[in-house]
Amino acid sequence: CKLGKKALIVTGQSMIKQGHMAALTDILEDNGIEYVIDSKISGEPTDVMISEGAKMYTDNNCDFLIGFGGGSPLDSAKAIGVLVTGGVENISDYNGKFITKPIPPLAAIPSTAGTGSEVTKFTAIADTRNQIKMLLKGDVLIPVIAIVDSQFTMNAPKSVTAATGLDALTHAVEAYTSRLATPQTDLYAISAIKKIFKYLPKAYMDGKDIEAREAMSVAAYEAGICINNSSVTLVHGMSRPIGALFHVPHGISNAMLLKSCLSYALSGAYERFAILGRETGVASHIDSDETAAHKFLDGISAVSYTHLTLPTIA
């Protein structure tokens, strides 16, 4: 389907430097689609970046959006869409509100395996005036098209691979242990967690491992579908303020909190955590639920803090 005649491509400088942008723009040109590029998205997106992107969209008479890059460009494209159709001056005016007005058509092309923003109804933007990280949500924020091609993740550095992979793991574990979990989200969550346990260390050690990169891209996609339906829990609730106040990348703040927050939640969901322990193979069927649950948390620690050497809250 044709989304429009002129696109605003929301991205970061890394996509241009790595040569990925040419692959996208060549296809647009071959199909007679005009475009302008907003490549100012860096780090955690802010309300200022969103306002600048919205101005570029309207000044150039664009009629659809392409988010191309990691979670930040994808989230930014969603927020720009909200701003250009909402009639307000700053995206922070939407803080705490459910977005219901349709945004322009959005295609999402992730270059990391983490946020799952290509399929979610969420966008996280920093409010620079109030020093908070806003979470905006609404079904209208789900991209019309998601193009998940692991080739775009092959050049991600180890630090990004680790941080984004732990974000996907956090999504899946929190979705599975959420009170809003459903049989459908359970299937996607278990599938994502098993992939991440197996393939994230491999993708981290060898970024050119095609099988590992593909598996991680699918896992992030699956975990994104999960949180659309069963949401997240304590880790994300605590990590957003850390990101806003100390400008810590989202995946890193999740990793810092992951074991401590899940340990706190463990006693209320031994059976759920035990199932994850057995499904990932770190616990056996002869283990009690309590033992299997603790073994699962030990497995998370092995992946997060041993294989990937990510920081803990301590």
Task: Please identify what each model-predicted range represents.
Residues P241-I275:
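Catalytic phosphate/nucleotide-handling subdomain of diverse soluble enzymes
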Residues C1-F64:
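ATP/NTP phosphate-donor binding region
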Residues T306-T312:
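Conserved small/polar residues in nucleotide/adenosyl-binding loops
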